[in-house]
C-alpha cells in the first residue's frame, strides 16, 4: 500500500469530527476519503487506532481551530501531529482546489463531503483564500479534513523524494 496521511477537523459547533485519509494511486492521482466522522470526544481513540492500522506518514491538524483540543490528546497517545499555520491552511485550500479543477483528485462521492463542498465559501487568509468555517449552513469538517490530508501528503512527497542537496 502507498503512503497515507490523515487530516482531522472538529466542526465549528463541536458536534462532529471528521478524519480524512489521502494517498497517491498508481495512476498518479491523489485519492482522498473521509474515513471517520463522529463525536469529537471519540476522535483521539479513533485516530490512534487508525494510526496503528494504517501507519500514516503524517497527520495534519489546524491548532487555531476547534481541532486544537486534539493536539495534546493525540500526542498523549503517541500520534505525531503536524500543526498547520495560517499559510499552510491557505496553501491546503488552494492546492486542493487546483487538484479538483485539473481532475487530479479522486474522491468517493461521500454525502458528507459533497454537502460540505456544495455549501463551501471562501474567506481571505494569509494573502490567499481558505474555507470559511463559521458562517456557513453546513458542517465544513469533512472538506477541511480532506484538504489537510491532501496537503500533508504533498508535503511528505516533497520532503521524502530523492533530490540534489547543496551543502
Predicted regions and their residues:
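Short, surface-exposed amphipathic charged segments that create phosphate/polyanion-binding patches used
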Residues: 94-103
Amino acid at each position: 500500500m502507498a503512503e497515507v496521511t490523515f487530516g482531522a477537523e472538529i466542526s465549528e459547533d463541536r458536534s462532529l469530527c471528521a478524519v480524512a485519509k489521502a494517498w497517491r494511486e498508481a495512476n498518479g492521482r491523489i485519492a482522498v476519503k473521509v474515513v471517520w466522522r463522529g463525536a469529537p470526544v471519540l476522535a483521539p481513540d479513533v485516530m490512534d487506532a487508525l494510526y496503528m492500522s494504517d501507519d500514516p506518514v503524517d497527520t495534519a491538524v489546524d491548532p487555531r481551530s476547534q481541532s486544537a483540543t486534539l493536539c495534546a490528546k493525540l500526542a498523549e497517545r503517541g500520534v505525531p501531529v503536524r500543526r498547520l499555520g495560517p499559510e499552510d491552511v491557505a496553501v491546503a485550500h488552494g492546492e486542493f482546489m487546483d487538484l479538483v479543477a485539473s481532475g487530479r483528485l479522486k474522491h468517493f462521492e461521500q454525502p458528507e463531503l459533497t454537502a460540505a463542498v456544495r455549501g463551501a465559501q471562501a474567506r481571505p487568509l494569509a494573502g490567499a483564500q481558505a474555507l470559511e468555517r463559521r458562517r456557513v449552513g453546513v458542517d465544513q469538517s469533512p472538506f477541511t479534513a480532506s484538504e489537510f490530508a491532501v496537503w500533508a501528503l504533498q508535503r511528505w512527497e516533497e520532503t521524502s523524494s530523492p533530490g540534489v542537496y547543496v551543502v
